[in-house]
């Protein structure tokens, strides 16, 4: 069978404390603890003032666009490829969002109608431990970016970094790797990840991508002690940490992110 995961509710406070104001909750593990687990997760995020997209406690919540305001309004739409063989309870399919393209586009359109200036789609998709996007990811990205309602797409699930590209003038990140994880050292690349930083320009309702930057990160000790996230470039410049490993991570990540030869994607 598949592994099942749960974490203490306090992690939501940590998510907020480091600066996240919204997140995707749609994944293949969304229902590892059933509908009570979905409710508990969203309750904890609400208590920490972190907005969320991808799972819901009610149909009304599922149908309400998720929008974060920071001057401009950013809409978040998310979905996942499956639930490891499980399904939401009968009559409650709204409790979890899949990545069927028409469904995601409809939600993106609803976010724009609700006032979002920019809409980002988060797709839990790909093949675990593979650095190349799957045909399904590519087809989904093509469909999504063809919609005027979608301004960017990013993916997660593979646990390793995947390439970035542009489709229909819009940034697509096929895989961001891991952010906080402690996977087996037999899985190369699972201690590497990227933080994306994208700058948008909105003029007369039209959205364009001004910058698309990636920040390489390396996850700390796999054996003992607390897990830490290391900003690769910062520690290389300061001489801190394992310089050889930091350098190889920087090279691995940069080679993968830019492997499709897309102009305008640079290391921050």
Give the location of each predicted region.
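Acidic, metal/ion-coordinating pockets
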Residues: 1-268
């Amino acid at each position: 069978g598949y592994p099942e995961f749960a974490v203490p509710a306090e992690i939501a406070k940590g998510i907020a404390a480091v600066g996240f104001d919204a997140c995707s909750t749609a994944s293949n593990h969304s229902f590892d603890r059933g509908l009570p687990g979905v409710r508990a997760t969203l309750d904890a995020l609400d208590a920490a003032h972190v907005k969320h997209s991808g799972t819901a406690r009610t149909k009304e919540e599922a149908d309400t666009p998720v929008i974060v305001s920071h001057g401009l309004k950013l809409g978040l739409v998310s979905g996942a490829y499956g639930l490891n063989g499980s399904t939401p309870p009968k009559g409650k399919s709204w409790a979890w969002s899949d990545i069927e393209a028409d469904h995601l586009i409809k939600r993106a359109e609803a976010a724009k109608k609700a006032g979002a200036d920019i809409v980002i789609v988060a797709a839990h998709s790909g093949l675990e431990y593979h650095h190349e996007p799957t045909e399904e990811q590519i087809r989904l990205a093509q469909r999504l970016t063809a919609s005027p309602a979608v301004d960017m797409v990013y993916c997660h699930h593979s646990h390793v970094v995947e390439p970035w590209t542009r489709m229909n003038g819009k940034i697509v990140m096929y895989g961001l790797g891991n952010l906080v994880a402690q996977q087996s050292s037999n899985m190369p690349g699972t201690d590497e990840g990227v933080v994306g930083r994208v700058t948008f320009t909105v003029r007369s309702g039209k959205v364009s991508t001004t910058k698309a930057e990636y920040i390489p990160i390396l996850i700390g000790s796999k054996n003992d002690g607390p897990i830490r996230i290391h900003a690769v470039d910062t520690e290389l410049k300061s001489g801190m940490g394992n310089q050889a490993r930091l350098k190889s991570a920087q090279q691995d990540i940069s080679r993968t992110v830019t492997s499709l030869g897309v102009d305008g994607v640079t290391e921050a």
